[in-house]
Amino acid sequence: MGNTIRAFVAFIPTDRCQSYVVGDLREMPLDRMVDLSGSQLRRFPLHVCSFTELVKLYLSDNHLHSLPPDLAQLQNLQILALDFNNFKALPRVVCTLKQLCILYLGNNKLCDLPDELSLLQNLRTLWLESNCLTRLPDVVCELSLLKTLHAGSNALRLLPGQLRRLRELRTIWLSGNQLADFPSVLLRMPFLEVIDVDRNSIRYFPSLAHLTNLKLVIYDHNPCRNAPKVGKGVRRVGRWAEETPEPDPRKARRYALAKEENQEPPPPLLPSSS
């Protein structure tokens, strides 16, 4: 019986189906939150735009590819979830919601972000994971209050040098990209607390010991020849994470000599397992 009902709903024309799903949502919820996640929406229900005091709007896991201009009426919105949809471009109306603090855009088909995103100067958290980004859009570097950036599972090869302007940034997730080298800009961001570069193509890690606020670095599933050196109390997740981060003097000398001769450094000397 349940399968029959699901099959019936699946074949209701789009407008009727949306009425069926959100038909009871006619008044502003007392908690100022609307959650339409997983509602099979193909078009945004316009009457939600009349809830001008709305603070949280969850539209995750639908079939949306556009948003109406009327969304600009939601000027009190602080959290907007658009992840797991079909957006190929971020609707510019989102950039008019200047009170946004958290924006979820993961699992879409985004290749870039509009310059207007810089208008969201209250944004603290931005999720861009599992899109089609081959570079981190420069506009991200203009979000001066950003504290958490999730850009994992894209096709990033480099990070822009301007990223160091984000002095409030504390957590950056870059797992599942195409980084061949540890991003040098991160070495100039001593305020970072969490760095995740899991599942990339990084072969050598520079010392991170000077990043005095660092608490966690995740570097597993890289073809690395060494573990990153970190300060006392910093947790490492990855190969050789339990080994001492202090370099063996012999290894340091051999590495320096190989570098002078423009040769590939020899494999690191690891402590024996005994």
Swiss-Prot record:
Ordered alphabetically, the record's keywords are: Leucine-rich repeat, Nucleus, Repeat
Chief localisation class? nucleus
Where's it found, cell-wise?
A: Nucleus
Q: Residue spans with biased composition (Pro residues)?
A: 264-274
| GO CC, one annotated term | cytoskeleton
Question: Can you name one GO molecular function term for this protein?
Answer: actin binding
Role this protein plays: May play important roles in cardiac development and/or cardiac function.
Kindly provide the name given to this protein in its UniProt entry: Leucine-rich repeat-containing protein 10
Biological source species: Mus musculus (Mouse)
